[in-house]
């Protein structure tokens, strides 16, 4: 049997599938004939950047992927790490950027559903979700609509499916005005004897289709996700999938039950490219072929043709390879959970994907041509940094107005440091994200140890809901926990992709260390503009180089992730405007004892406040800072350089201090610098602080000391009873890289920052700080709603 070959496709038809003319020529060469419509669509989605990483794959080879705890690295549905005691953690991050731009609710909701399937396809029960979100200015009505829709979609799916959303980050910047980013990370605890892989095997083994029915929703979603957005993208709403979280909940339980029978040889969820991707990837990974009959596929719409079946991205669907003779056992399980389950195909020896329809062959393509031997572009890297970066690096603080202990003159008016602190706390990127968190069910499953916003990373207790075969003890260690975080400062990466990406890894590890967790491994989500433009490719290549170095330096191997390119929006003149390069790092860490962790809020009056890392007298530039962008409307300079030796020592000291019971609170200095970190500790603990700084006017600007970022800095508080042993430990392990800042006060104290000669730099009440910080987002949304 062979597929039929119609006449040539027009250049427009080829381009509509996301293929270049030279790629179409390569398809014809490989097939020895012209493809038919269904085959053209299959190549279009599988050769899209979203599926085959044709521009990024050469760069990803730099990433470290091996380590003593790595059980599954890149190439499977999710990475898996060994937590000890027989426990294994699956985790992964994925993007749903383009769908969320045109249909924010369903785009975000199905992003949650898709990443959950990646987790339970491995044989792991999902235990937590995090998200990393980017939007334009929150003053803009369109941004507010996208923001509210995305948050509603995430909360709807996560809440209904019963998986807690335990943390994340939200940034606002005009660079994302037309192209929001929605990255979702999921964690799962392995429940099966063996990790479920995706490579098909066993000639003659049946191929099962399970889950929901197939419709026309999500048609060509992978190709849609690999193109720039424009005003016409709203017409691509059919490319956005529609999810059913209640059906997914049943699918989770049915799949885990099925895996435990031992009857499943391999499994693959139907995400991007649907049936096309699942059949071709399973066949290619197993070195076999799959023959699938579309007439067996449960359809929710009539009159569907092979092209539609093969490219549909209808949600909550899976493909299994079962042991021959045990298929009915699996079908019965899925029927009991109210789900579809049919034998739709067979594993064959010939390494092809053969699609049958109405008694004929609808498509026949070598599996490797679709899933492994895909196009690869080794693009030329710019010989030197682009002009925008070189100009930005020329910035110096000399261009800023002079400042004193009283404040700084901005646009003809004097602003006190109180004014500037409150302005920064009111900035949506820095402000509390409680407007977001309160819409999420973050305590379902009852294993969330710290509520979102209460610490620098999420902490989840590892309490198996089902018996785990590999447990060394039948009585699980209920003190064992994991921490997780998602991080990226895109302004850093825009201004210096290499140094900025290193800083992303360092901050993620620092956030884990602030709750007492040992960083273990990374999953990354690379969100960039077009790699076909020299600047876009330079940003991508340099960021990958920085991520690779950061992960090697901090011994956090990469277990997999996602690449989302072509994040650009056509402006009114039709010129593509790219987002800031945004390599989001999702990192997980191990907590031996969840009774020994830290939040970021002060714990008791009289505790001593320390700054770990570079002392405030150290010269750190304001370049790339939130202060420079918000207060001076300037995006320039270089991000803080990362000293990995100092990072390792500071983070280890923080973790040991927490485990020994010396440290009572910990919070890293990030956006907004030490002043914002101090304010956040006051707000979280509802306790003030009195800080004394030694100001050397000839050496340091006041704003540099207060608002500069970087320096591997962590604020910790220690009870005075532990002060002597703690300082002895600090002296031994950090030398001079720490200082005492002051003491924790009470609520009435507020935040007071003084010079050693008693000049007041900052004196502001907790009530004022909390009002700005806690209501910044809600206030903007309410104002816009009232106006409209």
From Swiss-Prot:
Transmembrane segments: none annotated. InterPro entries: PRibForGlyAmidine_synth_PurL, PurL_linker, PurM-like_C_dom, PurM-like_C_sf, PurM-like_N, PurM-like_N_sf. Keywords: ATP-binding, Cytoplasm, Ligase, Magnesium, Metal-binding, Nucleotide-binding, Purine biosynthesis. Its EC number is 6.3.5.3. Pathway: Purine metabolism; IMP biosynthesis via de novo pathway; 5-amino-1-(5-phospho-D-ribosyl)imidazole from N(2)-formyl-N(1)-(5-phospho-D-ribosyl)glycinamide: step 1/2. GO terms for biological process: 'de novo' IMP biosynthetic process. It is found in: Cytoplasm. It comes from the Bacteria. Mg(2+) 2 binds at residues 118, 269. Its main location: cytoplasm. GO terms for molecular function: ATP binding; magnesium ion binding; phosphoribosylformylglycinamidine synthase activity. Monomer. Part of the FGAM synthase complex composed of 1 PurL, 1 PurQ and 2 PurS subunits. Part of the phosphoribosylformylglycinamidine synthase complex involved in the purines biosynthetic pathway. Catalyzes the ATP-dependent conversion of formylglycinamide ribonucleotide (FGAR) and glutamine to yield formylglycinamidine ribonucleotide (FGAM) and glutamate. The FGAM synthase complex is composed of three subunits. PurQ produces an ammonia molecule by converting glutamine to glutamate. PurL transfers the ammonia molecule to FGAR to form FGAM in an ATP-dependent manner. NCBIfam families: FGAM_synth_II, PRK01213.1. This is Phosphoribosylformylglycinamidine synthase subunit PurL. It comes from Nostoc punctiforme (strain ATCC 29133 / PCC 73102). The gene is purL.
